[in-house]
Amino acid sequence: MHSPLTLPSQGFGLGLRTVHYEEIVATRPPVDWFEILTENYLVAGGKPLHWLDRIRADYPVAMHGVSLSIGSTDPLDMDYLRAVKILAERVSPLWISDHLCWTGIAGRNLHDLLPIPYTEGALRHLVPRIEAAQEFLGCRIVLENVSSYVSYKESELTEWEFLAELARRADCLILLDVNNIYVSAYNHGFDADEFLAGIPIERVQQIHLAGHSNCGDFIIDTHDAPVIDPVWELYARAIQRFGPVSSMIERDDHIPPLSELLSELDQARAVANRALCREAA
């Protein structure tokens, strides 16, 4: 069923946002690929799909969802998965990703990406759900580590141990969100480099970079600001460990002009290139 574990690096991408549609089509900026928010394109017809078709003609796209709720105790939402599959057949995505989390229970959506307990029981619950989703979609799914603000007393493993074991058992891939690692390390007091060291190199398909909000005692993953220096430094160490992984910039609020995001993407290229040169030296 599956191809080799991960695709070769696709370079450096941006999250596709509505305010930039026209400029992207008109100017064809130097972006290697775009990541789309899956849920924005699940309704047939309308402007979002019109613009996506035009942009897809010039750029590869990856699909990134927020509604799979793979960690929920509710049954998998097959209507949602069918809609995802229809969109995938239309756009031929590089890969399909979502989050290692739960978003609701008993049919109610909490509109947040909530962490799960890192236990053997949770692994046994998640693996068949991931396998079923992958079988239905016909591809490995790529699961992202979420930022977290609470933890469970029941947890038996670290987050990175859990993620590594889950990827192995379910034969899925990992979207490594470097900002989320930084946020969770700050909030819970663990070593971000230990997280990186615990993730299997062969499972990392993509890296996310984003900004956050520092509230003093804790920080929140808000995607509303540029990437800060400590996150760039963590990204450099991630590239040294995992190699030239496909990387992209997320911005979901206070979205700046496209030119500013292109400058930030150039910074990602520069950081990655320096990290690879240091690793090769």
Predicted regions and their residues:
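Active-site acidic/histidine proton-transfer and metal-coordination neighborhood
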Residues: 77-174
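Boundary/entry segment of secreted carbohydrate-active catalytic domains
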Residues: 1-24
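C-terminal helical cap(s) of enzyme catalytic domains, especially alpha/beta-barrels
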Residues: 258-280
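Distinct, well-ordered alpha-helical segments
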Residues: 21-25, 152-168, 184-197, 259-262
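Acidic (Asp/Glu)-rich catalytic clusters
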Residues: 23-29, 46-63, 79-94, 133-136, ...
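Acidic-and-aromatic substrate-binding clefts and catalytic sites of carbohydrate-active enzymes
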Residues: 22, 38-50, 69-78, 149-154, ...
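Gly/Pro-rich active-site loop or hairpin
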Residues: 45, 75, 113-117, 123, ...
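Conserved, mostly hydrophobic/aromatic
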Residues: 34, 96, 141, 177, ...
